[in-house]
Amino acid sequence: MGRLFGSLFHQTEELVMTPLRQRMSEDMQVRNFSLNTQLSYLRQVSLFARHFGKAPDLLGREDIRTYQVYLANEKKLAPNSIHIAIAALRFFFSVTLERDWVPAEVLPLPKKPQKLPIILSPDEVQHFLGCVLDLKHHAILTTCYAAGLRISEAVQLKPTDIDSQRMVVRVEQGKGQKDRYVMLSPKLLEILRDYWRMPRPKEWLFPGDRAGHPITRDAVGQACAKAHDLSRLSKPVTPHSLRHAFAVHLLEAGADVRTIQLLLGHRSLATTAHYLRIATNKVCATSSPFELLPRPAPTPPPAKPEYF
């Protein structure tokens, strides 16, 4: 059963799922988890089962501990990646299996290092976007920056989400299953119109290679990597780093943190406040206390000795 649970993850949903996998999927659906979260959690439990070659309901606390050590020491996953795996296993054991022990005690979350993202300057963003040669890829990556969208949100846009009358973009079912509106830049609108005139997409603003499906995040990531190579920028560039740049550039231009929180779709203001640590204009505009110290009087050179 363990192999079957793991092997079905990549198969299409019309195929038969194991009862255990079906039950976990239903547990997430009734709690209104996003589709991305459901797929991520199912994949993490699948990887857990494959690691031991057993059905996950046959595994216990010691197996979980062994798996955590494996993820950290052998796979050398980043804390964020381990967080996702632990969140999935916590849900599986506490909700789907209804284990009587507390998963939070057995599955401690690793402490995340407070690393600051590397931020592109406005000139670097402009140079990078100029290196995205494909019209569709240029349009979607420009949207990630101009509207501050997550890549998962950008790929799900529909033509009807672009409201040129109110000059807003509707972001439907973003992270946390919350809709929101973000600004529609006149420059972005012009780029989107130029792009839309060519294929005239109907269902998805950025359709993928598969009929009836949007462009995949992997495809956008590959286009981003190709443009980064062409740009020869020393800083790393991903679709998410364009979103980071959007937030920091707004903050440096004088936008308040609360407005940026609404635009980014952050649930907590504390998440948005992290960008205060990155906005360099705030740092550069603050004088060092060293400047307040009085300048020492110049020391005269030593007098030459008199010999006669």
UniProtKB/Swiss-Prot annotation:
May function as an integrase. Coiled coil: none annotated. Pfam families: Phage_int_SAM_4, Phage_integrase. The active site is at 150, 175, 240, 243, 266, 275 (o-(3'-phospho-dna)-tyrosine intermediate). PANTHER family: PHAGE INTEGRASE-RELATED, PROPHAGE INTEGRASE INTD-RELATED. InterPro entries: CB (IPR044068), DNA_brk_join_enz (IPR011010), Integrase-like_cat_sf (IPR013762), Integrase_catalytic (IPR002104), Integrase_recombinase_N (IPR010998), Integrase_SAM-like_N (IPR004107), Tyrosine_recombinase_XerCD (IPR050090). Residues 15-97 form the Core-binding (CB) domain. Gene3D superfamilies: 1.10.150.130, Intergrase catalytic core (1.10.443.10). Keywords: DNA integration, DNA recombination, DNA-binding, Plasmid, Transposable element, Viral genome integration, Virus entry into host cell. GO terms for molecular function: DNA binding. Disulfide bonds: none annotated. PROSITE patterns: CB (PS51900), TYR_RECOMBINASE (PS51898). Belongs to the 'phage' integrase family. GO terms for biological process: DNA integration; DNA recombination; establishment of integrated proviral latency; symbiont entry into host cell; viral genome integration into host DNA. Residues 115-288 form the Tyr recombinase domain. This is Putative integrase/recombinase y4qK. It comes from Sinorhizobium fredii (strain NBRC 101917 / NGR234). The lineage of its organism: Bacteria, Pseudomonadati, Pseudomonadota, Alphaproteobacteria, Hyphomicrobiales.
